[in-house]
Amino acid sequence: ALYIKLVEDKYGREDLKKVALALDYEAFWLRFNEGRGLINDILCLGRLDRHRRIVDLLCEQANAAIDEQLRASMGNVKSTKLPNGIIMNVLDVENFAHKFTFPPPGKTSGEVHDRLCKKFEGKPVVTIGYGPDFAVLRSRAVRMNIPQMVKELMEEIPNGGVSGGGHLVVGSIKFVGGMRKDVLAKLAEKIAACGVDDVG
């Protein structure tokens, strides 16, 4: 938020989205390397011409990787309309997404969710990307409270090793792999009990 205030007179929303994607992409590849010079160029803390070239190049590569991931993943999403009107979408990112590459499971789940929100325009949508011991949640127009859901899952499945959190409508949950089925089933029950908002 501080960076946005710093540059709001220079960049529009779309430019900032490109900078964010370039940072996300580069941070994935620089996990164990500080990459300070490159990050400074992405944030335009140096030369504007270098910033533009780097951001454009990284966004092009990131978008190509996202497109490739979604070509593999979208056909494997299972969608269910719940009695409360929510369209619940689940994707096994362990088995139906490329591993060890960009985008990672959380970003993949978010990109899948964004496309499903367009597909199910005007409807409440929840997307769960899950792996052997985690689930990533995204939602639109669903009255969820992920930190509260995590707390309840911890109490209801004490041997599940449940932890996690996030915001009200975006978050992640970790659990022990042997309890995945139980945790995901309880999570689906909780989503089915959520209220919904009008999609504007």
Model-derived features: where do they sit?
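Glycine-rich, acidic loop segments that terminate in or are immediately followed by a histidine
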Residues: 1-2, 6, 10-21, 53-200
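A conserved active-site cap/scaffold subdomain adjacent to cofactor or substrate pockets
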Residues: 3, 7-47
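Charged, low-complexity intrinsically disordered tails and linkers
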Residues: 39, 48-57
